[in-house]
Amino acid sequence: HGQTSGSPAMDTIYGGVLALSEFIRDDYLQNSSLDRRSAYILYNCIDTERFRPAPPPMALRTRLGFGPRDFVMLFCGRLEPDKGIHKLMEALSKLPVPNIRLLIVGSPFFGRTQQSSFLRKLEQQAKALGDRVQFTGYIPNEDLPDYYRLADLVCVPTLVEEAAGLVA
């Protein structure tokens, strides 16, 4: 992620490349001698057995402190500036509807909950919004479907072009 991998030397080993997005394909081809017709895209797929429509998990909504009339916006991902969470909170601060709540699922480092200077800034920004913002920290992948189901809206405020857009 964020590294260039194409090279004419590697192109002699194989006759094509499979990329997860146009962005990855185009980035690879910038440093490659492969013809564009030899670069295929296979977009990320969704496991429809895990991520399928189902009633929202009311027990989880309640445990997280959301009322029945709350409109829950979900951000799920790594907590870093490029992901645009701070901009999402700015937008939330401009919405005069108190029952719009933001649930932030994720951490600065994949796979573990750990502090970072950016997370501390987000927590400070969230204080100004009172109880409208809630952080869960890292949530294991197998538990994520319930978090998506409890949300009324999923937000992906990324500020840079994503290589694969795993969350969306």
Predicted region positions:
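Conserved donor-binding/catalytic core segment of Leloir-type glycosyltransferases
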Residues: 18, 58, 67-83, 89-92, ...
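A short helix/loop element that forms part of the nucleotide-sugar donor recognition site in Leloir-type
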Residues: 52-66, 72, 120
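Short alpha-helical donor nucleotide-sugar binding micro-motif in glycosyltransferases
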Residues: 138-139, 146-151
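A conserved, positively charged/aromatic
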Residues: 1-20
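Acidic donor-binding loop of glycosyltransferase active sites
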Residues: 149-163
